[in-house]
Structure formats: C-alpha cells, structure tokens
UniProtKB/Swiss-Prot annotation:
It is found in: Cell membrane. Changing residue 57 to A: No effect on activation by histamine. Changing residue 59 to A: No effect on activation by histamine. Glycans are attached at residues 5, 18. The gene is HRH1. Changing residue 56 to A: No effect on activation by histamine. This is Histamine H1 receptor.
Amino acid sequence: MSLPNSSCLLEDKMCEGNKTTMASPQLMPLVVVLSTICLVTVGLNLLVLYAVRSERKLHTVGNLYIVSLSVADLIVGAVVMPMNILYLLMSKWSLGRPLCLFWLSMDYVASTASIFSVFILCIDRYRSVQQPLRYLKYRTKTRASATILGAWFLSFLWVIPILGWNHFMQQTSVRREDKCETDFYDVTWFKVMTAIINFYLPTLLMLWFYAKIYKAVRQHCQHRELINRSLPSFSEIKLRPENPKGDAKKPGKESPWEVLKRKPKDAGGGSVLKSPSQTPKEMKSPVVFSQEDDREVDKLYCFPLDIVHMQAAAEGSSRDYVAVNRSHGQLKTDEQGLNTHGASEISEDQMLGDSQSFSRTDSDTTTETAPGKGKLRSGSNTGLDYIKFTWKRLRSHSRQYVSGLHMNRERKAAKQLGFIMAAFILCWIPYFIFFMVIAFCKNCCNEHLHMFTIWLGYINSTLNPLIYPLCNENFKKTFKRILHIRS
C-alpha cells in the first residue's frame, strides 16, 4: 500500500542477500498461511462490492469511497499478493521483464490508490461534520465519482517512472535480469520523497482531520444532551388529566390542563362546555411533515377543543389521554395512554432526507356540535393557548429528533472511519519506519523483519472489509443475507 512497497524486499541492494530455495520445506507452512490470507482478502472485498451493488440502502455517496478502497484492496489480494508469494518461492525472477513490470505497476498503483481512497474518505467525513449544510449541496455522486477518478489518475502516474525511468534519468546501476526491481531501486532521494508524499503527509493530514471530526461530533453530542434535558420526549408530550385524588393546588399554580378543564360560567350560570354525551368533531388543523418533493410523510391532527370536557370529568377516570391514531389520521381517546407508535415508525431515511422542512398548514379553526347540542363558545382561549404551547414543544422536539438522527449517522460514520484509519496506520507504519531506516542505512536490512512489515501492510487489505459490517448495520445485514446467516 505504499510507494516503495513489497518489491523492496526483493529488489533493493540493501536486501540483496534475500535468497530462498525453490519450494523449500521450511517455506511451505508460511506459503499456506499467506495463500489463505490472499484468498480471504479476495473473497471479502468481492463480498463488499457485491453487497454495495445488490443493496439499495448502500447506494450512498459515502459508500462510493468504500467501493474505491475495496477495488484497490481487491487488486492487492488478486494480483500483488499471489505474485509476491510466487517470487518468495523462487530463488530468482524467471517470469520475464514484462510480467515483472506489470506486477510492480499493480503493486505501486493499488497501494497508492488505497492510501488516497482512505484520504478522500476522511475529507468527506470531515466536511460532512464541519460544514453539513454547505457540503450537502456539493456532496453528490457525480462529484464523488470525479474525486475518486482523480485519486486513481494520480495513482496511475506511478506507471511513468516504473516504465520510463531510463528515458528521464541517467541509469546509475546495472539492471539485474534475475531480479524483479524498478530502475530507481537504489535512488534514495526519490524513494524518500515519494514515501513522504504517499504516506507520511496523507497520514498526518488524516490524523488532523479525524481529530477535528472527533471534536465536532463530541461537541454535537454534548449539545444534544443538554437539549434533551430541556425538551420532553414524544412519550412525555401528552395531555395529563386532572389528578383523580383531588390533591389541593396552591392558588395561581394551576396547570394549563386544569385551567382548560375548568368549566367557565356564562351569564346565566350555565356551563359553556357541552355535556359528555356530545360527540366531538376533530379540529381541522393538520400538521404536515413534508419533504422537498411535497410528498406527505405523516400527519398529526390537533385534538378538538371539545374533547377538553372529556369522559374523565364524567367517569372519574384518570387514564384518559389524547392519542394520535396514524392509521385513521385522527385523534382518539385511548385509555391506555398516549400512542406514540406512529411517530416512532417514521424511518430514519424519511426523516433524514437531503433537504427537509417542517410546515404547518393552518386553517380556520371551527368547532361544531351535533344539531341540538349547543355550540362551543369562544371563551376557550386558554385551551387554544395550551394547544399552541404543546405544538411548539412537539415541533421543537421533532427538529431535535431529526438532528439527533443525523448526528447518530455521522457518529457511526466517524466510528467507521476511525477503525479504518487505525487499521491503516497500525498495518503500515512499521513498514515505513523500517523503510526510512534502511533508506539511509543500507547495511541495516533484516530480511525476516522486512518481509513481516510488508505482509503486515498487505493484511490491511484483508482487515478493511471486516471493518465495514462491524461499524455499519446495513453492511452487517446485507452480509448476513448474502451468506444466508440467520441472526
């Protein structure tokens, strides 16, 4: 996955003493292990690509970068690893110069593309967290695809020095036909410069970006926690009836519900509110949660004013609540408590569209009673105020709920990126530390340690597809469906 990669093991003069006999018995257990890693790498990355292709929920902009990373890892597992194993079994390269150049090109290109894929994935997560609204308009599949193509184009620039080094630079050493090596294998300044550009600089930038992402997500979570303490949940936004035990209340401390329930008297001493036997009619003031295409997602209807009288006053029940019945689109009194199931069924995909708005369609509020039952007077301003108060709290909580879903998604994405970066750095930093040492100390090469660091870097291509289902529920479900694994 690096610029100066696995080929250094067999190409550099500093590791010139690395010789193995053909099919040595001591190498066979190692070959079996490395071949298993190779097969697992290919299988897992093919599984990732098939999962993204077959599952619509995975057709997101962010997963385009995952696809790019999987393609690079697939090349490592399908081309680079097998030829490295083959070269390990041979005492010299006997497959010809063209095949050698092909292997070196795939090694350098795939390694660089893997690094750049992680890098642009990190930038995407950073902008999604730091500039959510501005980046939302910019974050399209077309732009993401163009960015990925740009990363691969830069990676393919490695073909130029691999195939044409002698056309641009003077040859300083004699090429050895029995070894597969680049023409710049002994050019220390070039290898150090490319190592810095390909690994050290992107890694430092990714660490800086991820520190910013972690800080932003943490601040958002803390902010949301403070908001949640001051806002009721959906289950708490319900109209509580009067205490059936008749607990005494201090003057001036009556709740809006109690004020609403108190029967005002008209001039004749009669009750303004109608009797419990009267059938209430719903107040036509729908609240519409709408998306950009004006598709109606859900409706919550305000309760009718004449429900205020309630059976609670007539029957003495303390369990009468006003509940939203989503299936009929109207309010019903439910003796089991407030039904919030309809609100909780709004899926995250519905609530988290690229652009959402909350709009309220107000109409003239009219309440009628059945013929001969009398009419509700306009003296229920207190009740209407309580309706408005409840609606404002509900709408405020709904916005925070949507914001919470968005932050949960970003937090999961940040977690996934964190695991990918951790695996990337832990797998490749040993190789690059060792590489910088032997770049300046040609006699400091230990062939076994060098080989270990190279294959540790290759194992990063095996670990990446294991990280996705661990951090993404959609990947996990899709993998289980494809592999026919029952939960």
